C-alpha cells in the first residue's frame, strides 16, 4: 500500500505437497524445501478461482506502525491477558463497524515487515502486539481475525509486504533486530545478513537473490497451508527506493544479471520470478485461495510506451520494476487491485482514464479487477485535489463508485484504509457508504 504504502472448498492435496509442507513447518530453519517454491519446468499458469456473484467491497487494515490495529495504547498494558483482551475487542469493534457498512472483505496485513502476526516457524513474532520482537502476544491474531470475520460472513485476504525487514534503520531498530539472535526463529536480519540491503531508509531483502524469493514464498506457503485464508495479497512494495536511499544491488546484478540487456530488465525479471513462484505455490496447496497484487495505479505512461495509459504518473514498471500488466496477461494473478488514488479532475492521472485502461487490460483475461481508492484523502484539504473537500468528498466518491459499477470488467472496490472510516472529516462519506453498501 501507499503508506508511511472463494469459494471455500476443500482442496485435494497431493501427497508430495503434504510431505513438503511437513518438512517446512517442522523445521526452524529459514530455508524452505526447494519443492515448495519452484514450479516444475514447463508448468502452466495456475487456474484462476471462480468469482463470487457479489461485488468486492473491501478495506485494507494496516498493522505496520499500528496504523489501523492494534491500538497504539495497548502495547503499554503490562498484563498480557488484559492486553490481548483490549486488542481483540478493538478488532471485534472494527469488524462490527465494517459489517454495518457493507464491507465484505478485509485485507489484513499479516507480514508488515520481517515479523509475523501468527506463530510462524520462519519469522519472529511482531513487536506490534507487545512492543518486543519475538514476544508471544498470548493469542494468534491471524486466527482471531479469521474466526471473527468468517462468523460475520466476511472474507479475509492475508496481506504481505514481501521484502521489507524494518520501517527504518535507526540504531534502536538495529538493536532490536540483533536481540533476536538467541530466539527461534530469529530475524532474517541476523540469520541472513548477506540478504539485507538498505533502500528507502528501510532494511529490505535483496529481490535479486534467488534464495530470497524462495524464502518469501515459503512464508506464504506456511500461511496458506495452516490457515483458512480466502486470499493472499502483495502490496506495491517491490523495489522501493527514495532519492537519498537507493538499493545497492550492484554485486547481486553482477552475479545473477549477465543474461539481461539492462539492470532494469533484470530487476523486473526478479519480481516476475517471485510472483510466479508464489502463484504456483498457492495453487499447488489450495487452488481455491485467491492470489492478487495491489500495485501503483499507473503501469506505464503512454509517453514512454504506446501501450501505457494517458497519464503522467510514477509508473510501477519503471519505478518499482513491476511489470504488472504482464502478470495479468500471463494468468499469474486471480485479481489485480491497482491503487488509483486520484480524482476525476487530476489531469496527470485521472481516475476514469486509469480505471478504463485497466478494464481494457483485464478484458481478454481471466484476471479480475478491483480498484483501490483513496479514502484517506476524503475531507483532506488539497490545492491540487480540491474534489475531496467538496460536500465532504461524497460527490467524488460517488463518481468513482458509479464508474466501478458501470464497467463490467471491474469486480469491486477496496478502500484505503480502515482507520480513516473513523476520522471526523470522513463522516459524510462514511454515511454515504452505509446508505449505498450497508444493510
From Swiss-Prot:
Lipidation sites, kind N-palmitoyl cysteine, are 28
What CDD domains does UniProt report for this protein, alphabetically?
AmyAc_family (cd00551)
Secretion signal: which residues? Answer: 1-27
GO biological process terms, alphabetically, are: cell wall organization
Xref: Pfam families: GHL10
Record region (Disordered): 34-54
Topology with respect to the bilayer = Lipid-anchor
Q: What is the superkingdom listed in this entry's lineage? A: Bacteria
Query: Which chain positions have S-diacylglycerol cysteine-type lipid attachment?
Result: 28
Q: Tell whether Manganese is among the UniProt keywords.
A: no
Q: What are its E.C. numbers?
A: 3.2.1.-
Q: Name the GO cellular-component terms.
A: cell outer membrane
Which family does the similarity line name?
A: Belongs to the glycosyl hydrolase-like 10 (GHL10) family.
The record's function comment reads: Divisome-localized glycosyl hydrolase that cleaves peptide-free (denuded) peptidoglycans.
Q: What is this protein called?
A: Glycosyl hydrolase DigH
* Biological classification of the source: Bacteria, Pseudomonadati, Pseudomonadota, Gammaproteobacteria, Enterobacterales
Amino acid at each position: 500500500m501507499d503508506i508511511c504504502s472463494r469459494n471455500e472448498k476443500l482442496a485435494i492435496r497431493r501427497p508430495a505437497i503434504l510431505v513438503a509442507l511437513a518438512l517446512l513447518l517442522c523445521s526452524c530453519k529459514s530455508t524452505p524445501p526447494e519443492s515448495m517454491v519452484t514450479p516444475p519446468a514447463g508448468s502452466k499458469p495456475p487456474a484462476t478461482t471462480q468469482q463470487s456473484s457479489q461485488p468486492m467491497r473491501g478495506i485494507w487494515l494496516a498493522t505496520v506502525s499500528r496504523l489501523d490495529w492494534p491500538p497504539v495504547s495497548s502495547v503499554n498494558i503490562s498484563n498480557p491477558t488484559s492486553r490481548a483482551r483490549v486488542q481483540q475487542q478493538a478488532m471485534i469493534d472494527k469488524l462490527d463497524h465494517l459489517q454495518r457498512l457493507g464491507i465484505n472483505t478485509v485485507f489484513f496485513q499479516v507480514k508488515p515487515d520481517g515479523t509475523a502476526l501468527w506463530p510462524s516457524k520462519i519469522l519472529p513474532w511482531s513487536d506490534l502486539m507487545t512492543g518486543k520482537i519475538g514476544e508471544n502476544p498470548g493469542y494468534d491474531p491471524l486466527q482471531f481475525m479469521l474466526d471473527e470475520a468468517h462468523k460475520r460472513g466476511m472474507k479475509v485476504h492475508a496481506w504481505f509486504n514481501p521484502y521489507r525487514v524494518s520501517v527504518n534503520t535507526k540504531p534502536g531498530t538495529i538493536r532490536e533486530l540483533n536481540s533476536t539472535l538467541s530466539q527461534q526463529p530469529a530475524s532474517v536480519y541476523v540469520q541472513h545478513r548477506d540478504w539485507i540491503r538498505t533502500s528507502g531508509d528501510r532494511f529490505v531483502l535483496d529481490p535479486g537473490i534467488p534464495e530470497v524469493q524462495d524464502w518469501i514464498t515459503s512464508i506464504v506457503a506456511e500461511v496458506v497451508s495452516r490457515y483458512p485464508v480466502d486470499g493472499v495479497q502483495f502490496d506495491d512494495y517491490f523495489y522501493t527506493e527514495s532519492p537519498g536511499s537507493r538499493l545497492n544491488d550492484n554485486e547481486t546484478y553482477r552475479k545473477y544479471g549477465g543474461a539481461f540487456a539492462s539492470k532494469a530488465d533484470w530487476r523486473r525479471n526478479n519480481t516476475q520470478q517471485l510472483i510466479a513462484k508464489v502463484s504456483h505455490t498457492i495453487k499447488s496447496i489450495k487452488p481455491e485461495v485467491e492470489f492478487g497484487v495491489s500495485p501503483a495505479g499507473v503501469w506505464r505512461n503512454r509517453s514512454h510506451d504506446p501501450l501505457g495509459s494517458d497519464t503522467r504518473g510514477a509508473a510501477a514498471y519503471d519505478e518499482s520494476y513491476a511489470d504488472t500488466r504482464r502478470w495479468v496477461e500471463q494468468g499469474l494473478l486471480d485479481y489485480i487491485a491497482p491503487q488509483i488514488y486520484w480524482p476525476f479532475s487530476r489531469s496527470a492521472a485521472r481516475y476514469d482514464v486509469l480505471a478504463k485502461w485497466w478494464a481494457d487490460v483485464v478484458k481478454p483475461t481471466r484476471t479480475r479487477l478491483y480498484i483501490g481508492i483513496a479514502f484517506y484523502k476524503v475531507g483532506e484539504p488539497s490545492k491540487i485535489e480540491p474534489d475531496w473537500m467538496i460536500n465532504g468528498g461524497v460527490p467524488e466518491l460517488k463518481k468513482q463508485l458509479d464508474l466501478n459499477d458501470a464497467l463490467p470488467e471491474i469486480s469491486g472496490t477496496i478502500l484505503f484504509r480502515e482507520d480513516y472510516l473513523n476520522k471526523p472529516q470522513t463522516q459524510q462519506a462514511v454515511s454515504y457508504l452505509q446508505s449505498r453498501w450497508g444493510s
